[in-house]
Structures are given as C-alpha cells and as structure tokens.
Amino acid sequence: MKSVITTVISAADAAGRFPSNSDLESIQGNIQRSAARLEAAEKLAGNHEAVVKEAGDACFAKYAYLKNPGEAGENQEKINKCYRDVDHYMRLVNYDLVVGGTGPLDEWGIAGAREVYRTLNLPTSAYVASIAYTRDRLCVPRDMSAQAGVEFSAYLDYLINALS
C-alpha cells in the first residue's frame, strides 16, 4: 500500500541509494501531521453513518433526476447501492488518513472507477457532489481541529479530483 514512507523508500531503493535529506524531511512532515490525520480518521469513523447519509441525501437533492426511471437511483435497491458506494469512498478516505497517503484510494477506489461508472450509467458527478458536500459541510472546531480538518479536506479534494 502506497504511503509517503513507502514511496520514499521505494524511490531510494530503485535508485540504489539511501533516502536523501529531503526524503527524510518529507517523512518527518508526514509523521508530524499524523496526530491530526488520526484525529480526523477517528471523527470520521465515529460519525460515518451520518456523514454518508448526509452526503447521499445532498447528492439526490442536487440531482433529483437520478430517481427517474432508467437512472442510477430509480428504485430503493439502486439508491442503497449509491449510499454503499459513498460509504466505501469514506472508508477509503479514512484508511488514507490512517496510512498518511493515497494508497487505499488509488488501489481500491479510483483505479477503473470512471470506466465502471460509465459502463453502468452511473454519473461520477453525483459521487463528486456527495464528496464535495462532505468537504464543504466540515466545520472547525465543531467537527474536528483545524489541522485535522486540513488533512481530511485534502483527501476529499484528492478523491474529488480523481473522480472528476
């Protein structure tokens, strides 16, 4: 699984060298931000059901046509699958926060997602809207500390950009 640490070590090993000072500074910065990332991961894990419901509800409010016949949310089973997918992405963001890198999203969430959604006639814009809602709804200090909010938002932005 890719993280800042594994990326630095892999690059150094591929070049047949020890990690450079800038490599070590990158790792040190990542470690210094770990407390904020873990705070964000804890808050997300503790509130994930509400986060997923609010994100999914916001998506269907913005894209009400998705509940029309022939669309991605035409029946309760398909609506539930959309919420399941939002939950899956939130879990991957949580994993990214824990490991301090985008490996989980890259490996389990983004690779091929656009092609799958296109094949199944599922608009990625709806998922982007639900993730953006979560990012925009975040309130510091109500939900988490400022630094934890920065870390959480960074991974949400990464996911939004990857699905856009």
From Swiss-Prot:
Q: Which UniProt keywords apply?
A: Antenna complex, Bile pigment, Chloroplast, Chromophore, Electron transport, Membrane, Photosynthesis, Phycobilisome, Plastid, Thylakoid, Transport
Report what the protein is called. B-phycoerythrin alpha chain
This chain's function reads: Light-harvesting photosynthetic bile pigment-protein from the phycobiliprotein complex.
User: What residues bind (2R,3E)-phycoerythrobilin 1, as annotated?
Assistant: 82
> How does the UniProt record describe the way this protein sits in the membrane?
Peripheral membrane protein
Looking up InterPro entries in the UniProt record yields: Globin-like_sf (IPR009050), Phycobilisome_asu/bsu (IPR012128), Phycobilisome_asu/bsu_sf (IPR038719)
Provide the residue positions that the database annotates as binding (2R,3E)-phycoerythrobilin 2. 139
The UniProt record lists the keyword Transport:
yes
What CDD domains does the entry give? PE_alpha
Q: How does it assemble?
A: Heteromer of 6 alpha, 6 beta and one gamma chain.
Q: Does the keyword Membrane apply?
A: yes
Tell me, in one coarse class, where this protein mainly resides.
plastid
Q: How is it modified after translation?
A: Contains two covalently linked bilin chromophores.
Family to which the UniProt record says this protein belongs: Belongs to the phycobiliprotein family.
